[in-house]
């Protein structure tokens, strides 16, 4: 996967998709989300949008999201992160499934037990999602497993005396 995201053709695909408004999965106030599905690779590419200070702040959010994904590498129930292209496009695994609010599944108790494990796993890695009230950030995968997506509002635990950060992870 690293070889794909380091290829100039992939960066060109991203820039062409943005210029032509193709392969767009979603657009939010933060940025554009592209869907790349070729040669067995099913990926999401997140980009920051805006100009000047607004773009800078949104790019910083994207970098914080990248840091959160790095900490959660290998956690079941969190999409794999493949890195940054040119330091500005975040590439993550595309998750096939249904948003929690629209999903139906056979064993709710087992699903919620698994969901709680996912939450505990990324909290143990020093990551708090920040927006689980949005049920679109909680997915039920095609094989009925929980998956938490979109860590754009995540908090990452920092070491040292950072009273707000420490307080967030104590509560």
Go through each PLM region and give its residues.
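C-lobe/activation-segment region of protein kinase-like
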Residues: 141-171
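Short C-lobe core helix of eukaryotic-like protein kinase catalytic domains
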Residues: 114-124
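Conserved structural core of kinase catalytic domains
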Residues: 58-64, 68-114
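Active-site beta-strand termini and strand-to-loop segments that position acidic
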Residues: 35-40, 93-94, 141
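Catalytic-loop of the protein kinase fold
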Residues: 124-141
């Amino acid at each position: 996967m690293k070889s794909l995201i380091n290829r100039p053709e992939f960066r060109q695909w991203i820039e062409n998709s943005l210029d032509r408004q193709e392969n767009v999965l979603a657009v939010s106030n933060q940025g554009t989300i592209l869907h790349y599905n070729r040669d067995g690779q099913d990926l999401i590419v997140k980009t920051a949008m805006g100009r000047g200070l607004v773009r800078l702040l949104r790019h910083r959010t994207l970098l914080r999201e990248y840091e959160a994904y790095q900490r959660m590498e290998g956690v079941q129930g969190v999409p794999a992160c493949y890195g940054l292209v040119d330091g500005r496009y975040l590439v993550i695994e595309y998750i096939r499934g249904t948003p929690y609010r629209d999903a139906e599944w056979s064993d709710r108790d087992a699903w919620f037990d698994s969901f709680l494990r996912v939450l505990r796993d990324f909290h143990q890695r020093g990551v708090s999602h920040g927006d689980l009230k949005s049920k679109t950030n909680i997915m039920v995968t095609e094989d009925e497993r929980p998956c938490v997506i979109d860590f754009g509002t995540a908090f990452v635990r920092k070491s040292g005396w950072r009273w707000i950060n420490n307080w967030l992870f104590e509560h």
